Amino acid sequence: MAAAAPSPSSSAFSKTLSPSSSTSSTLLPRSTFPFPHHPHKTTPPPLHLTHTHIHIHSQRRRFTISNVISTNQKVSQTEKTETFVSRFAPDEPRKGSDVLVEALEREGVTDVFAYPGGASMEIHQALTRSSIIRNVLPRHEQGGVFAAEGYARATGFPGVCIATSGPGATNLVSGLADALLDSVPIVAITGQVPRRMIGTDAFQETPIVEVTRSITKHNYLVMDVEDIPRVVREAFFLARSGRPGPILIDVPKDIQQQLVIPDWDQPMRLPGYMSRLPKLPNEMLLEQIVRLISESKKPVLYVGGGCSQSSEDLRRFVELTGIPVASTLMGLGAFPTGDELSLSMLGMHGTVYANYAVDSSDLLLAFGVRFDDRVTGKLEAFASRAKIVHIDIDSAEIGKNKQPHVSICADIKLALQGLNSILESKEGKLKLDFSAWRQELTEQKVKHPLNFKTFGDAIPPQYAIQVLDELTNGNAIISTGVGQHQMWAAQYYKYRKPRQWLTSGGLGAMGFGLPAAIGAAVGRPDEVVVDIDGDGSFIMNVQELATIKVENLPVKIMLLNNQHLGMVVQWEDRFYKANRAHTYLGNPSNEAEIFPNMLKFAEACGVPAARVTHRDDLRAAIQKMLDTPGPYLLDVIVPHQEHVLPMIPSGGAFKDVITEGDGRSSY
């Protein structure tokens, strides 16, 4: 998307201090509009927020739970640690763009991912005047929003991305939808045409508030420069409270240019939202859950991304009960994968023993999950023998797909702390003993381990991830694109802790891996960050190689290159008699050639790169990748016939699980 020149008609400053200003409230509306209550209702709401559409977006996958908000909790990160010192005098007028940047500073923002254009260049000019905020310049706005997501997923603090109006703003759409589905706290700021041009089909005008209404937790169109401090404060509060999600702030260019003396003490206007935040968990219900545990013989924990802030409390709960743990794709890392009580991932490509455990259980403890179709398969058959306990921060998720016997709408962390307190008070009295159940599951682990075959000196993709796990001691931050490589990374890397695993779960957005790794490397510069990617996903945002080079980010890219859209090929093999329908990404006129040459992309951006084709050379090649300072790309050539197994077909049940076969067989 080419950056556009500014509109010549919007270059003069507008002063809100002067009643004679051409943009005074007598000529233009001064209200900042939040979105309507519901995307299917056209009646506009009051000008203050009374409701967020938590109940609307029922298909979201968990990213994290939030802190429960109390009256004495500080909203701003900087307020928690030190008094903010402005570079402006208290009564000094400044541009709206400077107010916006200072508002970000006051929220503790130190990094943004921003791509300039005509409608946002005032914000970029203000960023150059900030000594606090660093802009990491992506090479595409989608790269910027995915990087903001990676930052948020890796750090827990809202990621910030900025784009211009029109195509710049619409390039954020996939990232906003992804953040909503995975409950990731990000704040996206877009430039907009001047207020007087809104609705005139002006150059690069897009009604981005309308476009993103159904894929954001909340959004704003700022129509009064004096609203900026409040709007930014609310945006960060909304992004990380309750069920986290993306917030969009659309700022017209004339608002950015107006002079104003900001009021930093404006209160937030969120009465409806505040009243809907989850309350403390009901103690009687917690006691009932403990009683169900004591009465069960085959309990299983089913944990999701909602547990990512509660890892220590979850571990303590498992220690007190001895209940085995199965994780969703988004929940990986909440409980150590290598622990003897871990069943690893369940669902479509989960382990046989995790799915066996859920299928055989008499009590399913579903914490921070949404009973997604990729986990449950056929709903009627999922955990059909079990009583179900569902704890979630979002009331809309409870009973949406699977009706629980006991449910609590609460912060998972507080619920776990309450359960642990009850269990500790009863220690020695409950006499929980699930050893026979654990032994049954251990036998399933022995009988149905994750495994793969080797063919000559070809490199099995699963083996590449195993070696990476060994060489990093399972401590790297891993990002992925979407496809087979994503599932193998979920299966074969042993995640030790939360915020190690960055992947597009609910939306399944290809091109996510490299930008997300950029965000993680910016937010956690002392960690090893590896993008495990597929050739199809990688090339969708390959331009971000320039970003990691220019920023000297030590992002390692391990590319599992089979020159195919591997997951679609797998389905073609299984369900379409191996008929190839545009899934070959190489050069049909020369199939012996590795095409495109990923090493040339890296070379063009000055990123060191190497290719490995033989299994015996793989370990040394990965070690060199890890040892090389700065960014590095390792092109690992793998067979396209490999299938991700186990596999429960879409809409199937545990009895339908597939454990054998690949593209070398016919079906």
Curated annotation (Swiss-Prot):
It is an enzyme of class 2 (transferase). Belongs to the TPP enzyme family. One of its GO terms (molecular function) is acetolactate synthase activity. Thiamine diphosphate binds at E141. There are two distinct ALS genes in tobacco. The enzyme shown here is derived from the ALS gene on locus SuRA. Acetolactate synthase is the target enzyme for sulfonylurea and imidazolinone herbicides. Residues 484-564 are annotated as: Thiamine pyrophosphate binding. Pfam families: TPP_enzyme_C, TPP_enzyme_M, TPP_enzyme_N. PROSITE patterns: TPP_ENZYMES. One of its GO terms (cellular component) is acetolactate synthase complex. PANTHER family: ACETOLACTATE SYNTHASE CATALYTIC SUBUNIT, MITOCHONDRIAL, THIAMINE PYROPHOSPHATE ENZYMES. The gene is ALS SURA. Its cofactor is Mg(2+); thiamine diphosphate. Residues 1-94 form a transit peptide. GO terms for biological process: isoleucine biosynthetic process; L-valine biosynthetic process; response to herbicide. This is Acetolactate synthase 1, chloroplastic. Pathway: Amino-acid biosynthesis; L-isoleucine biosynthesis; L-isoleucine from 2-oxobutanoate: step 1/4; Amino-acid biosynthesis; L-valine biosynthesis; L-valine from pyruvate: step 1/4. FAD binds at residues 243, 349-370, 392-411. Disulfide bonds join C161-C307. It catalyses: 2 pyruvate + H(+) = (2S)-2-acetolactate + CO2. CDD domains: TPP_AHAS (cd02015), TPP_PYR_POX_like (cd07035). Residues 1-45 are annotated as: Disordered. It comes from Nicotiana tabacum.
